[in-house]
Amino acid sequence: MEKIGIFVDVQNIYYTTKDTFGRQFNYRALWKILSARGQIMTAVAYATDRNDESQRKFQTALRHIGFSIKLKPYIQRADGSAKGDWDVGITIDMLQSAADLDRMFLLSGDGDFDLLIQTIKIDHGVPVEVYGVPELTA
């Protein structure tokens, strides 16, 4: 049985799914599909912490499914822009996990991960499958 890892860019998946389909992404269905493909060794959801009750409920639901949650503070800048980017954290975790996995799944439409995916494939021989909203995936 393949050892698999799941890495989720929660903000990216939330907004692209909501904008395209008008609803939330079904993490329970994803877990069912991927757990049928192998043994899930690690599953991490990377999110921002806005200290919001609905977000805490969502994070609790993800934990019940089997995800561990990594939170980064949500920073609202004076100019109105926001910061809560997990690209570097996801990259580090995937690179550190690659030697222990047979297959990786990245949920994000962020094109910045292309070099990471190629590095994992070349240096570790581990295939990385990307899940994202096709119209909004770079």
Predicted regions and their residues:
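Short, well-ordered alpha-helical scaffold segments within catalytic/effector domains
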Residues: 27-28, 87-92, 114
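Acidic, metal-associated active-site segment
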Residues: 90-100
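Domain-level signal for Mg2+-assisted phosphodiester chemistry and nucleotide/NA-binding surfaces
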Residues: 1-86, 99, 127, 134-135
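Active-site histidine-anchored catalytic micro-motif
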Residues: 99-138
